[in-house]
Amino acid sequence: MSRPNTRNKSKRPRADDCESPSAVFKKIHSTGAITKGDIKQLYMVWKPVCHGCHGNSKDSPNCFCGLIPAANGVRKSGLWQRTNEIIRALGPNPSTDLRDSTETPAGLTNLGATCYANSILQCLYMNTSFRLGIFSLEPDILKMHPVLDQLARLFAQLHSSKMAFIDSAPFIKTLELDNGVQQDSHEFLTLFLSLLEGSLSHSKVPGARTIVQHLFRGSVSHVTRCSSCGRDSEASSKMEDFYELELNIKGLNNLEQSLDDYLSTEALDGENQYFCESCQKRVDATRCIKLRSLPPVVNFQLKRYVFLPKTTTKKKISSAFSFPGQLDMGKRLSNPSSSYTYGLSAILIHKGSAANSGHYVAHVKDESNGQWWEFDDEHVSKLGLHPFGEKPGKSSNKTDQKPQGSSTADSVTNDDNNSCHEAAFTSTMEEMFSSTDAYMLMYKRIAKDENGIESNNISSNNSLPHHFVDEIDERNTSYVKECEEYESKKDVHLAYITERRQEVKSVLTEAPATPEEDSYFWISTDWLRQWADNVNPPSPIITGVRVHSSIDNSPIQCEHGKVPASKVTSMKRLSAGAWHKLFSKYGGGPTLSSDDFCMECLKDGAKNSVSADVYRDRKASLRSIAEAALAGNNPDGPLYFVSRPWLTQWLRRKNVDIPSDADSGPTIALTCTHGNLLPEHASGAKRVTVPEDLWLFLYETSGMKIDDIVTFPSDSQPCGICSQQLSVVASVEDNLRAVKLKQRQSHEKLTSGKSLALHPGQKYYLVPSSWLSEWRAYITATGKNISSLPEPQSLEVTINSLICEKHSRLLQRPLDLVCKRGTITQKASNTDGLTMISESDWILFSEEWNVAHGKGLCAEIVFSKSSQDNLQSSEAVPILVEDLDQSTNDLSNDLGGREPYVRTDPEVCEECIGEKESCALVEKLNYQNEDIQVYLVRGKEAPKSIREASAAVPVPDRRTSKRSRRTTSGNSISLKVSGSTTVYQLKLMIWESLGIVKENQELHKGSVEIEDDFATLADKCIFPGDVLWVKDSEIYENRDIADEISEQKVVVQTEEGFRGTLLTSSASAQLCQDISFSD
């Protein structure tokens, strides 16, 4: 059984009776009649209605596939994009900010850098006693004190607002805080409580007037005790108020150790002895802090920042710090009590590594149900029954499990070695938490009844004050209305989208007209596609004003107002029902029915089609004639000149229906400026003769005006003027060729570029190497290039430029001497230095370049009496040591250790050359954003190849191979540097790229180590393209480069703190301002 053929299963079969458009046009042109069948063929009406194409086919007016996506399909934009994308275009949905319930706390907006204030405000609000105290304030007091008023309004919104977060801007603005500057949350709390304490003192409500002192104020005394008499100092009995206890954490692991450190006894001895009033002398003594009373809420401020005197900046201590869920403070009091048990109620967290930046969040316990919440500005997250969230996979009620201290640190274990007070860790039920970012801890006293059982004494009167009810209700009503309006707008828009989609599907379902239907209408594909794909149907533009949506068929009309067959790929064939649906709703047009085919356009198309066939056939028949003409085989009869390159390109072009622009001008390249035939030996005037038939075809299809085409029969004579000019040029070139030939023969060895063997006692002359290189290229240029290269600069001018005006000495040095196999030569160069030539060559140069023989720069090879004599001679050029071999050594031994050097007349001007080289060096070291290569070397020393590349002297304006910038296995890097880049900055780049800390880098250029971090690369003579190598000493530990960079970026400024805000205003100034607000 044979398998079915599926190779062409996706191709639609062509109807057997379908003719090609070319055949139809030929029939129309020959008969002059247009039949109904011709219309079907030319307008592709015969094509079947298709289904399931991958895209919309331009070749079929009956194809409506791809105008809309498949079922359940979507597009990136327009009517058929995802529903959520359509809704997003309506703007933000206010309902996303809806608060779940008043049982869920609300957040506060961050105005830029106000997270420090937000976290403190949330801690204060979640304290039920403090909140009730603020809510109990009299309205008259609120009017007199703007800060209290804004705080009460903020608390009221946090209490009853339907929004998930509250705008803190009015409160921040009232305090005159700079919302763009990050501040310290501890300092803010201290100053804010002080400000509140002064403002609340005007209230007549007892619970509100002293709420700050009642909740947060405790007392301590600084006790100094004489070691001799055992008496306390008089000042020891004085008590000082505190609102928080500042605890050291550096080198300490937990809260118990920090409290021990805070209450530890200090010995006063030696130079710090205390003068005892009782003993009347300086004696040894002890000093300590004693807790006299504790408030219901104790704030522990953890000193996470230490001052660095070297950089005058603060650095954060990021070590883990442990603290318990319950804390017994009774034993800490000067009069011990067992009823002072505190529970953890809030944790203020500072995220970030820098002291002057980062982010504050607060973890606060809800006193009503024991749930913990994270307050991160606008975002509020439920943490569960533990301050850092439930441990995944663990039940919170298992007493043998300790909760996680944070998401990144394990809970602290009860290790006696790490505990200062065993009593604090005896219970296996006790919860311990650990954090690397905890900045402040709030503990609230646990109230107990007479039987020692914890009691919840939270007041049930937690309702909103009556003077805020109307305001909050109005805000909530406005917000709910905004949410409802958005939902209504969304519903209307989605209903419209659904309606539009149903409309498009309905029309497109009815749109296809079968080939047999005689009644149909044409519509622009572009308009139909936009109508089917856009949310709003396309609209024409009239005088710049968009009018009602309407059908636009003007792009598919011809100049006669009908439908041309040439536009069939830009239009679709609609059924009568689909057209009437669109036209009745959108109007427009013009209406183009099945009878609106254009007879005039069809006749023109038939004529053009026949002309194209004729052109194509004629060109095909003449190709063999053109090929024979290029081969020189022409038939008898008249011949004409055409450009040979042009005819070659004409043959290479594809056979098209009409002549192209490239077919014009077959004789343009042969026509001179005088309108005559160019001589054949002129540049670009190569020609070939073609028969008359081919010429007439090229003439007719050139596309040029008749007057612009110049015909050259084969007996045409070349232009006399151009011939004469070319003869003159040829004569000049012949003379130049003879002169160059003579010079090449006269200076045969010099022309070849071979090194000249130098001998002591002979006279030589010096010529600039650059001039000699130009002269060699000039005389060796032949053929077409014989006159293309310019003549070198006058030799006399060149020689004169080598003499300095100040000292009349040479401004360049002779090239270095090289001695190989007993022969002395000069190092080869085409750009730098002076090359020595023989006396005979100089005599010939004098004659050829009209230079006086006496102006020559003389030189000779001499031997020094000793190596010291050679070094002391200013005009001496030393021999290259690396080129010495055994023969040279034998020669040197025969000469008694003397070395050859070049003696010049005039002498070399070392002063001017040194000044010029210094300027060039300075200019070269003044570079910007250039590449250097750094290799990482593992081992004791760098490989020889790297050392030599690193020590190589850079060549001016050298081109560096791209391959030299490739890295191999991460062992080399290419860095962009400038001459002003410091060694320190370069080491930071290497640190970032190769991971070697700055202190461990042993950086070298060649064998010289690069030191002094403050020196620039220009100071160290490091040039563009240089190769350096670095080795890791591994002496210092690795650390993060971010620490180094952040320290460098910190600009030391005087800390302003809260200067200029109400938090630092005096009480009198605050009172005056309060009165002015009330006015």
Swiss-Prot record:
Residues 495-598, 613-715, 738-862 form the DUSP domain. The keyword Transmembrane does not apply. SUPFAM superfamilies: Cysteine proteinases (SSF54001), DUSP-like (SSF143791), Ubiquitin-like (SSF54236). Keywords: Hydrolase, Nucleus, Protease, Repeat, Thiol protease, Ubl conjugation pathway. Residues 961-1037 form the Ubiquitin-like domain. Residues 402-417 have a biased composition (Polar residues). It catalyses: Thiol-dependent hydrolysis of ester, thioester, amide, peptide and isopeptide bonds formed by the C-terminal Gly of ubiquitin (a 76-residue protein attached to proteins as an intracellular targeting signal). It comes from Oryza sativa subsp. indica. Belongs to the peptidase C19 family. GO terms for cellular component: cytosol; nucleus. The keyword tRNA-binding does not apply. Coiled coil: none annotated. Recognizes and hydrolyzes the peptide bond at the C-terminal Gly of ubiquitin. Involved in the processing of poly-ubiquitin precursors as well as that of ubiquitinated proteins. Deubiquitinates H2BK143ub1 of histone H2B. This is Ubiquitin carboxyl-terminal hydrolase 26.
